[in-house]
Amino acid sequence: MDNYTDRLLPSSLIATRPPMMKNEQFLPPPPPVAEHGFSALIRVGLNDTMAYQNNGESFNENIILFDCGTSENGVVSNAEILGINFNSINSVILSHGHFDHFTGLPSILKRIDKPIRLICHPDAFLRRWVLFPNGKDKARMPFLDKEELRRQGAIIVTKKNPSLISQDGVEEYPYQLHDNLVDNSTPKLLVTGRIPRTTTYEKGFPLQYKEDLNTGNLIPDPLVNDDQAIVANIKNKGLVIISGCAHAGIINTIRYAKLLTGINKVYAVIGGFHLTGGGIYEDAIEPTITELKKIDPRYLIPCHCTGWKATNRIIQEVPEKFLQSSTCTTFTFD
């Protein structure tokens, strides 16, 4: 799921676009859904040991769903187009507790016939408000309900610190031991947990407040401490870093991924970079691009909340690195 769709984009070695026809007929509606939200199905495997059962299920593949979109059924509809069976997923991971990343979760849980791990930072369950710049208007955000999610089959796992996700479970991540991302039998993904803020220009979400459940008072909550990303290590190529919104800042996110893994080479950065919304977000576009050029990933795939202005500047500055995201696209890094 992404904010953008283009049915005419060509496929490439890296990007496989959604099908338009089957058996010499154009596919009937609905078309792929685009919305102001994000969701990614992530499959990680071991090339030298990948084996498949007769039904196509992988013996040795780690499949997770990262975020769930902003509408009730958008991700479900797109999954049907792509032939995705949600029962193949071993974990759902939330990048943070904003509704454009979790609203589709209940519909997804209904389609999973087993208890499923839901991994997130504990602050994802905060009750949050937005106070608008005029100082008068405010709006309460939709929030996650732990008990309702448990009734729907979610096994809630809250983690503040980095963790490794495999088919079998969740484990603490020892810093700078990048061999733990992949062992001889089990492909793993790194979830960063809370991301330290080191840049001066990535300022979080200044309009956000959290509700004190005892007093009802609103407390400034600009950092979005629950914001986290997913990291994979592609052998001989470097890190693939996947962000939901990058409220922590996409540069802070990349720096932390490199620190956690001890790997400096970045192969791809994909997801929301949160450089739209005017003001401080657009002020961060130029320093962000300057730093991205220094980091020098092979691919940049801005999605969701990156925004047109920032995406256009990326195309201008590093056209050879840019890949266009479009909902229902499959990106393959191997």
List the model feature ranges, each with a label.
Residues 46-50, 59-63, 172, 176-191, ...:
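Beta-strand-turn-beta hairpins that frame and shape the catalytic cleft
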Residues 73-120, 125-126, 260-270:
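Active-site metal-binding motif and surrounding structural segment of the metallo-beta-lactamase
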Residues 99-102, 117, 215-327:
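Cap/insert and terminal regions of metallo-dependent hydrolase folds
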Residues 1-60, 188-226, 230, 234:
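Zn-dependent metallo-beta-lactamase
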Residues 32-33, 44-91, 132, 209, ...:
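Pre-active-site segment of Zn-dependent metallo-hydrolases
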Residues 125-228, 323-333:
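Metallo-beta-lactamase
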Residues 1-3, 68-70, 97, 123-124, ...:
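Active-site metal-binding loops of divalent metal-dependent hydrolases
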Residues 42, 67, 79, 96, ...:
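Divalent metal-coordination and catalytic microenvironments
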